[in-house]
Amino acid sequence: MLHILMRSPFETNMVLLMNMLESVDDILMLQNSVVLALKNNVFLNKILSYSVSMYALKQDLCARGILDNISPNVNVIGYNRFVDLTVKHKQQMSW
């Protein structure tokens, strides 16, 4: 499943998200949710323990001035890869 996050982790039910995660899932961070990608983020470290792949949209990272401060465990992607992820996952959930 592709989990598409759009809001800050402080505005999202992160416990519910983590309870739903499976190792084959991907997480895509857009809009304000990209703050989740910051190094040493408590939520990020917990999510990484589920062995899911994490992606953040470069344009949203740049718009918030945090591109240079994100975790090396987060894949920075553009719109083409965003589309690839939506094609890869038939099931998607927006948070």
From Swiss-Prot:
It comes from the Bacteria. The keyword Cell cycle does not apply. One of its GO terms (biological process) is tRNA wobble position uridine thiolation. Pfam families: DsrH. It is found in: Cytoplasm. One of its GO terms (cellular component) is sulfurtransferase complex. This is Protein TusB. Keywords: Cytoplasm, tRNA processing. Part of a sulfur-relay system required for 2-thiolation of 5-methylaminomethyl-2-thiouridine (mnm(5)s(2)U) at tRNA wobble positions. Its main location: cytoplasm. Heterohexamer, formed by a dimer of trimers. The hexameric TusBCD complex contains 2 copies each of TusB, TusC and TusD. The TusBCD complex interacts with TusE. Belongs to the DsrH/TusB family.
